[in-house]
Regions:
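SAM-dependent methyltransferase
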Residues: 69-142
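Conserved short alpha-helix immediately C-terminal to the canonical SAM/SAH-binding motif I
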Residues: 1
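Conserved SAM-binding loop
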Residues: 5-6
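A short glycine-rich, Lys/Arg-flanked "PGG" loop and its adjoining helix->strand segment in the class I
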Residues: 50-67
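C-terminal lobe and adjacent flexible extensions of AdoMet/dcAdoMet transferase-like proteins
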Residues: 131-177
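Conserved SAM-binding strand-loop segment of SAM-dependent methyltransferases
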Residues: 11-28
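A short SAM/SAH-binding and catalytic strip from SAM-dependent methyltransferases
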Residues: 32-50
């Protein structure tokens, strides 16, 4: 994925730095002015301590006055997904997605079966299993403050307004002290 992204971004000057690292162990050679963490990547950190370490590493990586932007699935969205079975069927692709939310540990587990039609007419199956943890706005805000971020704001799903309970995805923006 990073190789494809790098090809598409190669014409930019300077080209953006794309990394594949464990977030809690993030290491850069130089500081950056901003960091963006998208597609609910924080939810994939299933241990609260790993989220805290990630925020600390980002604080150490972002220059003073720099920005951090990230998104998470709202707790309410993850709870609503419990027991859902979702289907997407097209001429050459069939996708089956099954979910389970374990409220006692705030974990969303989902399995994805993806079938792709091959040139010879056979269907090729890929299987993925994902685990995400739900975090409240209050938890994430406290951990950002502890790491040294200020001006912490939440934004609604694709709207420049404060996040509310109806938002399935919550965007955070903050500034490194």
């Amino acid at each position: 994925m990073l190789a494809q992204a790098q090809q598409k971004l190669a014409a930019l000057d300077p080209p953006p730095l794309l990394l594949c690292q464990s977030m809690p162990q993030l290491r850069l050679l130089d500081s950056v002015d901003a960091a963006i963490c998208c597609l609910d990547s924080i939810n994939y950190l299933t241990r609260p301590r790993d989220v805290q370490r990630t925020f600390n590493r980002l604080h150490d990586t972002i220059a003073p006055g720099g920005s951090l932007v990230f998104d998470v699935h709202a707790v309410s969205k993850m709870e609503k997904l419990d027991g859902e079975v979702l289907l997407d069927e097209r001429e050459d692709v069939f996708c089956l997605w099954r979910t389970r939310y374990r409220k006692n540990v705030k974990m969303l587990d989902y399995e994805v079966d993806l079938f792709r039609l091959q040139p010879d007419g056979a269907w090729e199956r890929d299987f993925e299993e994902h685990h995400q943890r739900a975090y409240t706005v209050e938890e994430l805000t406290a951990w950002l403050e502890e790491a040294g971020f200020t001006a912490i704001r939440t934004h609604g799903e694709l709207k420049l307004r404060r996040a509310n309970e109806r938002d399935g995805r919550i965007y955070f923006s903050c500034i490194r002290k």
